[in-house]
Amino acid sequence: MKFFIDTANFEEIKEAHAWGILSGVTTNPSLVAKEENVSFHDRLREIAELVDGSVSGEVIALDAEGMIKEGLELAAIAPNITVKLPMTPAGLEACRFFANKGIKTNVTLIFSANQALMAARAGATYVSPFIGRLDDIGQNGVELIETIADMFTIHNIDTQIIAASVRHPQHVTAAALAGAHISTTPFKVLKQLFHHPLTEKGIEGFLADWNKRKGE
């Protein structure tokens, strides 16, 4: 499973990129709205120049014509921009348009296997099931990942599954085991993946032994 980072904060992206683990970035209107003094297109351009992999930029229009117009503008920013579309009839209409043009798409706000299958058949490059939000309403988000992965395998579907709405490190592990191709993970959760008390205790022990030896 690959790691994407789910943020529009350029400093967070730069730090995670330096770790050598990032394969892409996802953004959405809510994340971009938190960033000040930079336009949406300029921020996507900055990210796309730094990160070689897919950079998802989401449309805001609700009609297919508007989505297509916005998506073409986003795709023109850089060759690694992926147009992010909502799971609606208009979103799938736009998805098919972009698929026919060879433009990558990420269909977001997936909450059922049927939605994922429809998006895949509309030509989506990626589908993004929201596991945390499903957990919030008492459903099993990771189980949905597994169902979609099984369905795609049975029917030889190439669309990749992005585990989204990732809340904690356990979501990352579970998504990987369930068959997600990618986890798009907030910066806070990515940093949490580093930590284990035995790792930190081991580092402290090595340093203590080394400093003791130096003092002899």
From Swiss-Prot:
Looking up Pfam families in the UniProt record yields: TAL_FSA
What the entry lists under InterPro entries is as follows:
Aldolase_TIM, TAL/FSA, Transaldolase_3B, Transaldolase_3B/F6P_aldolase, Transaldolase_AS, TSA/FSA_arc/bac
Q: Which biological processes are named by the entry's GO terms?
A: carbohydrate metabolic process; pentose-phosphate shunt
Might you give the EC number(s) for this enzyme?
2.2.1.2
Instruction: Give the keywords, sorted.
Output: Cytoplasm, Pentose shunt, Schiff base, Transferase
Active site annotated at which positions? K84
Question: EC class of this enzyme?
Answer: transferase
CDD domains, sorted: Transaldolase_FSA
Record's subcellular location: Cytoplasm
In its UniProt record, a GO molecular function of this protein is:
transaldolase activity
Question: Does the record's keyword annotation contain Cytoplasm?
Answer: yes
Q: Does the keyword Transferase apply?
A: yes
Reaction(s) catalysed by this chain, per the record, are:
D-sedoheptulose 7-phosphate + D-glyceraldehyde 3-phosphate = D-erythrose 4-phosphate + beta-D-fructose 6-phosphate
The record's GO CC annotations read: cytoplasm
Q: In which pathway does it act?
A: Carbohydrate degradation; pentose phosphate pathway; D-glyceraldehyde 3-phosphate and beta-D-fructose 6-phosphate from D-ribose 5-phosphate and D-xylulose 5-phosphate (non-oxidative stage): step 2/3
- Similarity-based family: Belongs to the transaldolase family. Type 3B subfamily.
The job of this chain, per UniProt, is described as: Transaldolase is important for the balance of metabolites in the pentose-phosphate pathway.
Protein name, as recorded: Probable transaldolase
